């Protein structure tokens, strides 16, 4: 099934105001069981995280996990990357409109992306099953983690 047309349609409705975007994030949290598990694991990880925290959301999509993490941890520096430039632009616009200066989004192909020892945590949800060169991506993730990350 092709999800991009559905995502585009949803985006055109929910991107019209910050309020609707937040409603959309809440609906995703309610409809997708994995959201509950991801938020739980991020909370557990955050309870032991110290110092300056940098997070990479690899395959950030609509940015719902970046919204969650930046809401709970405003001191974290969060970078979302994706291959869909339209979603990157939408996310940058939304997070700018709501004043979340600790979150940014950029284009990145995960098979070639590394940012040496930059991140304490790398989150990648519903992404790896779409990438044939998954071993290369995990090598890149490892190279991008800070020591102990």
What are the residue ranges of the model-derived segments?
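Short conserved AdoMet
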Residues: 50, 132, 146
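Conserved phosphate-binding and hydrolysis motifs of nucleotide-dependent enzymes
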Residues: 59, 148-149
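A short His-aromatic
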Residues: 126-130
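A short glycine-rich, Lys/Arg-flanked "PGG" loop and its adjoining helix->strand segment in the class I
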Residues: 136-147
